[in-house]
Amino acid sequence: MSEADQALVGPKADEPSPPAEEKDEGGGKEAAADAAPGPSASFRLMVTRREPAVKLQYAVSGLEPLSWSEDHRVSVSTARSVAVLELICDVHNPGQDLVIHRTSVPAPLNSCLLKVGSKTEVAECKEKFASSKDPTISQTFMLDRMFNPEGKALPPMRGFKYTSWSPMGCDANGRCLLAALTMDNRLTVQVNLNRLQWVQLVDLTEIYGDRLYETSYRLSKNEAPEGNLGDFAEFQRRHSMQTPVRMEWSSICTTQQVKHNNECRDVSSVLLAVLFENGNIAVWQFQLPFVGKESISSCNTIESGISSPSVLFWWEYEHNNRKMSGLIVGSAFGPVKILPVNLKAVKGYFTLRQPVVLWKEMDKLPVHSIKCVPLYHPYQKCSCSLVVAARGSYVFWCLLLISKAGLNVHNSHVTGLHSLPIVSITADKQNGTVYTCSSDGKVRQLIPIFTDVALKFEHQLIKLSDVFGSVRTHGIAVSPCGAYLAIITTEGMMNGLHPVNKNYQVQFVTLKTFEEAAAQLLESSVQNLFKQVDLIDLVRWKILKDKHIPQFLHEALEKKIESSGVTYFWRFKLFLLRILYQSMQKSPSEALWKPTHEDSKILLVDSPGMGDGEDEQQEEGTSKQGTKAGLQEKSKEGDTEETPEDSLTAGGDTGGREPVEEKLLEIQGKIEAVEMHLTREHMKRVLGEVYLHTWITENTSIPTRGLCNFLMSDEDYDDRTAQVLIGHISKKMNKQTFPERCSLCKEILPFTDRKQAVCSNGHIWLRCFLTYQSCQSLIYRRCLLHDSIARHPVPEDPDWIKRLLQSPCPFCDSPVF
């Protein structure tokens, strides 16, 4: 591996340690240092470049142009669209590069005009302000693009200012929503349901403007009556109170909804906080799944009292099953504080009694970005929250924990990290590691280490010039499980000169080793492969390179399967076997559609009457030479295939050497065995749902009798749980079979195959892998990795069948589209 592709990062031996500066809430010094002199050997980080680098069509825009969602999609704000890069761990692709699915959210063609009054009144006021003889009014009005988004002689304000991903489970497919803020202050919520096209669900700027117009631009009835729009101060006030600065999603919360029969049911909802230019915060509440304007439950406005707000983030704290939430707001003048958010009718949530000031000094250091990470304090034996914020070239941190004495606040700054202002900050939610970057291509890793009093940071320097060459950085984002770091780069200075043209690229580097990723997958509490795509992609890359599964991973996984038997470990084993199978495949040297040189010559020799004898002899000689060359090539390929056999043997295969074809057949047999085990486990789950939700003999859409017969058809399958469950269901069905019938010929569809149903007339229907009903329609859904298909829910389906149809793929945990 070349030096450009891999670099050991960490401060040099002669690099001075950054000075530490720590203050508590009252401004006094604390004893704990916040930055250690340098990283210990256990914290040294090895970063490796991953291909491909994704080129962007347009220049990036906005302050934080890069964001990584929980469902492994990277959004990049550009001057014409939001580029969305989805990381896919494709088990059917033998290539070692990252598999990235690319889509985009285009910017609206028309400019956004904030609603500050009736159209006639607004037009008259604009004409009045533009022709005013007072230069403080006319010039302010003409130069402010908030008042003139069209630009007149200036180019229109296109592009995106900021994007924010919702948590998983918010759209109809159980994935993330994208909130996008354009440069002309239009805030929309976008969804991607078919993986090819993004659709706008709602325009929140328009809805909020209509609400303000209906209330005469007053937030409460106690406020003074609205002023005259012809007054320039009132004109500015109405614009600033609906100009978004930032927006952030909360985690999914549960609310109580009362039915008509006075029964209560739990309804999932999510909150979107929008920070406006005047300091107000609008908190939108959406019912899930979010499908459009009808999913909006409420919108409440909070007055923060912060002048020149610049950024916000959700603070969510959980301790002893009690949850507290608030909004962390930062100012361009320096202060940072938490505002209480009263979540009415939200189960298990409590609110702060009053705002909590995290930093009160008006030191003119603008708060650029805020992140909040939940952690566990090993000394205090309780949960805590780590808040980090970029302020100039410094990192402000604050540790919040609740004890018997109340809310404890420890805060300080980490200095000496960058010589230029920090342009982007991101945090790993798994362990609290913070990454910062400046525009000179330097990235810092800050690892929090708890002390008796508060905490300190081990920090390391990642020089991107050692990995990519001379580059400038514009944003970073860490993957959900901390395996990758995405970086927006352009060319740096060459020979002391800036590049003529800027080519914006999204680069990826690894932050974890294969051993760390494998250990995290084995000990994961999530137990969902799709939610850990970045980790399993590292494992995929390792197996494709080495062409064998490491012995330690194989043994550890077998122990997990024997001890727990959880289907997550079976799915992990299936994933490893599939990647191993792909690593053993021969990569075609030529395109499959091209005819080979050897075949064309043989056809010419065998066909009679094609030229004279000399030509035939020449062609025959040529064909023999081609055949000989082909045999030589095959022998060379056979020689190259010895390497994977050796590596497989080293990976724990104690027997003699076997041909690659036999090894592939052996792996294929193991894959089919694991798939059959996962199929039976899911069949048991489906039968359990049938037993719980049917009281009498009922003909559901699920082929219950066929599932029972299929499970008991294998004599080697001895599962006591399945036998007891089938016995109870058989008693409930009372000798009824309710067979499926073909929609074309009305013949019975026997349940003899888990993948398809074939009637006596030869009509073939694919089976839904979630309910095992035959999909007798032209349209159906498919999982992300094309492992299985599923039918669409219909209105007559009961709720429990609809819940089954919302399940992920039983083989790869991927969502179904």
Swiss-Prot record:
<dbReference type="GO" id="GO:0005654">
    <property type="term" value="C:nucleoplasm"/>
</dbReference>
<dbReference type="InterPro" id="IPR036322">
    <property type="entry name" value="WD40_repeat_dom_sf"/>
</dbReference>
<keyword id="KW-0804">Transcription</keyword>
<feature type="cross-link" description="Glycyl lysine isopeptide (Lys-Gly) (interchain with G-Cter in SUMO2)">
    <location>
        <position position="624"/>
    </location>
</feature>
<feature type="modified residue" description="Phosphoserine">
    <location>
        <position position="647"/>
    </location>
</feature>
<dbReference type="GO" id="GO:0005739">
    <property type="term" value="C:mitochondrion"/>
</dbReference>
<dbReference type="InterPro" id="IPR024761">
    <property type="entry name" value="TFIIIC_delta_N"/>
</dbReference>
<keyword id="KW-0539">Nucleus</keyword>
<keyword id="KW-0808">Transferase</keyword>
<comment type="function">
    <text>Essential for RNA polymerase III to make a number of small nuclear and cytoplasmic RNAs, including 5S RNA, tRNA, and adenovirus-associated (VA) RNA of both cellular and viral origin. Has histone acetyltransferase activity (HAT) with unique specificity for free and nucleosomal H3. May cooperate with GTF3C5 in facilitating the recruitment of TFIIIB and RNA polymerase through direct interactions with BRF1, POLR3C and POLR3F. May be localized close to the A box.</text>
</comment>
<keyword id="KW-0007">Acetylation</keyword>
<dbReference type="GO" id="GO:0000995">
    <property type="term" value="F:RNA polymerase III general transcription initiation factor activity"/>
</dbReference>
<feature type="region of interest" description="Disordered">
    <location>
        <begin position="1"/>
        <end position="40"/>
    </location>
</feature>
<dbReference type="Pfam" id="PF12657">
    <property type="entry name" value="TFIIIC_delta"/>
</dbReference>
<protein>
    <recommendedName>
        <fullName>General transcription factor 3C polypeptide 4</fullName>
        <ecNumber>2.3.1.48</ecNumber>
    </recommendedName>
</protein>
<dbReference type="Pfam" id="PF12660">
    <property type="entry name" value="zf-TFIIIC"/>
</dbReference>
<dbReference type="Pfam" id="PF19336">
    <property type="entry name" value="DUF5921"/>
</dbReference>
<keyword id="KW-0832">Ubl conjugation</keyword>
<dbReference type="GO" id="GO:0000127">
    <property type="term" value="C:transcription factor TFIIIC complex"/>
</dbReference>
<comment type="subunit">
    <text>Part of the TFIIIC subcomplex TFIIIC2, consisting of six subunits, GTF3C1, GTF3C2, GTF3C3, GTF3C4, GTF3C5 and GTF3C6. Interacts with BRF1, GTF3C1, GTF3C2, GTF3C5, GTF3C6, POLR3C and POLR3F.</text>
</comment>
<dbReference type="InterPro" id="IPR024764">
    <property type="entry name" value="TFIIIC_Znf"/>
</dbReference>
<feature type="modified residue" description="Phosphoserine">
    <location>
        <position position="607"/>
    </location>
</feature>
<dbReference type="GO" id="GO:0003677">
    <property type="term" value="F:DNA binding"/>
</dbReference>
<feature type="modified residue" description="N-acetylmethionine">
    <location>
        <position position="1"/>
    </location>
</feature>
<dbReference type="InterPro" id="IPR015943">
    <property type="entry name" value="WD40/YVTN_repeat-like_dom_sf"/>
</dbReference>
<keyword id="KW-0012">Acyltransferase</keyword>
<dbReference type="InterPro" id="IPR044230">
    <property type="entry name" value="GTF3C4"/>
</dbReference>
<keyword id="KW-0238">DNA-binding</keyword>
<feature type="modified residue" description="Phosphoserine">
    <location>
        <position position="600"/>
    </location>
</feature>
<keyword id="KW-1017">Isopeptide bond</keyword>
<dbReference type="GO" id="GO:0006384">
    <property type="term" value="P:transcription initiation at RNA polymerase III promoter"/>
</dbReference>
<dbReference type="GO" id="GO:0036408">
    <property type="term" value="F:histone H3K14 acetyltransferase activity"/>
</dbReference>
<feature type="cross-link" description="Glycyl lysine isopeptide (Lys-Gly) (interchain with G-Cter in SUMO2)">
    <location>
        <position position="221"/>
    </location>
</feature>
<dbReference type="InterPro" id="IPR045803">
    <property type="entry name" value="DUF5921"/>
</dbReference>
<comment type="similarity">
    <text>Belongs to the TFIIIC subunit 4 family.</text>
</comment>
<feature type="region of interest" description="Disordered">
    <location>
        <begin position="603"/>
        <end position="658"/>
    </location>
</feature>
<keyword id="KW-0597">Phosphoprotein</keyword>
